[in-house]
Amino acid sequence: MPGRVSESLEYAYSDWCLSVLAEDLGCKEAAAEYFERSRSYSKVFDEEQGWFRPRNADGTWKEWPEEGRLKESYGCVESNLYQQGWFVPHDIPGMADLMGGRTKTLADLTNFFEKCPSDFLWNAYYNHANEPVHHVPFLFNRLGAPWLTQYWTRAICNGAYKNKVEGLVGNEDVGQMSAWYVLSAMGFHPVCPGETRYELTTPLFDRVEIKLDDRYAKGTRFVIKTVGNASEACYIQSAKLNGKSLEKCYIDHSDIMNGGEISFRLASYPNYSWGLE
């Protein structure tokens, strides 16, 4: 999309969704075609600048602004390239490769959060008031640092939401602002709708019970429990799914719909070895 990085990235993700649908329908050729198109996000990545950059209609790069990727509405709407550039949910390994590898990407992602204000209100870095970044705290899980997902989701839950009038950090926007909180406070959230994977993070509550609808689920309830939960205990030390040790930082949608229980042991310090499988 000439001039628009945000739309180019969203179209690439949409093509990936279509490839998944086509695969499920048995349309192999269409699935392969749309999967290949979903890799088009790389065409708006400028290796010289080390980040996504809009192109002109003739394929040349648009002039790079003095503020760089922090320039408001340069190649996107109501945001900047630093915020929009993390939207490759369907190919995070490929995105990280473009950005210089996992270690460099992780450092840049950490910088993205460390420079934002404590209330996460409108700013040039992680801006929770604007929904395009809502999946970004969970990218730490995908990059091999789940303790940072745990830290930042707890910080956002505490800093961007208040139990008062105007308690949301931004416009509700069709329920997304509240939906993010509900899922994150329960301890799981999707990064890539179209996948059945949910990223795990630290629940806010000692116990949550989800009643399942028997029209769609095999189970009746999915229970989330924590041991050692406290305001400062934002780090997962270990987890169990239906009584068995869980070493992954994610679960599948079917784990919820089958019913059962997931439990977390929490502490005020990170466990750098949990969730790396």
Predicted feature descriptions by range:
Residues 215-217, 231, 246, 269-271:
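Generic "edge-of-domain/loop-turn" microfeature
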Residues 232-238:
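Beta-strand-rich binding/interaction modules
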Residues 1-204, 208-223, 254, 261:
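Active-site core of glycosidic bond-cleaving carbohydrate-active enzymes
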Residues 241-244:
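Short strand-turn-strand beta-turns centered on an Asx-Gly dipeptide
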Residues 247-252:
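Short, solvent-exposed S/T- and G/P-enriched segments that are highly enriched in secreted/extracellular
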Residues 253-277:
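C-terminal beta-strand-rich structural cap/linker in extracellular carbohydrate-active enzymes
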Residues 222-231:
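Short aromatic-glycine motifs in intrinsically disordered, low-complexity regions
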